[in-house]
Amino acid sequence: MSRRHNSAVASSARRVSAMMLRHWYLLRSSWPRLLDLIYWPTVQMVTWGFLQYYIATNAGFFARAGGTFIGAVLLWDILFRGQLGFSISFLEEMYSRNLGNIMMSPLRPFEFIIALMVISVVRLSLGAVPVTFLAIAFFGFNLYAFGLALVAFFFNLMFTSWAIGIFVSGLILRNGMGAENLAWSIMFLFMPLTCVYYPVATLPAWLQPVAWLLPPTYVFEGMRALVIDKVFRPDLMLDALALNAVLFAAGVFGFLQLVRSARRHGSLMQSGE
């Protein structure tokens, strides 16, 4: 029984790694894809960095809170690029009309999800890591100085991005390429409510409970507490983790239901450009 279980785990790992290798080869063979991973994070960081530098030299509060803009930009990019990296990898299969083949192969849906989660981290790392060093060189802002807090920020943001990316991929699978724009735009719907650049208290009182239902809100509040007050708030990270567990489970459940619906309606073989 144990040998059979080990064999099944090994087979599953091989299928996941094969899917990861496919997307790694796509990245490695296309310099425009690699350039796109770095271009927008760099533009955002430089633009907001210079704005933050200007404000910091002209306002007492922002002089005390220097770095919150750059920190918010870098953390937002983790959230946005994590979701986009997952969704783009999924769309690559749609564009190539390969999704039907994948769903009829021995690769299971949860293995497909795991492979796309890992490749989204690879995509994010290729784009975000160089930008963090540019932030040090241009503005003296060292994201890695957050220490263990950065690990908590990163994992919470990634779990949110995966949950949303998984669910959006299911919607695209079920509804076709007409829903493709969701992959590019859905995170911007959350941007005002997650309070990326300002405290939750800035929102109207009736919107604040909604903001606190979103895990990234806790991360950005935690970042501001760390930068401004020099205090790490583990309570915020635990709250975000609990919400992420619910959100991630809902995202996976929704994806599996949408896959079943797509199979029933025959939309798996109708995807593509």
Where does each model-flagged region fall?
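Hydrophobic transmembrane alpha-helices and immediately adjacent juxtamembrane helices
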Residues: M1-E273
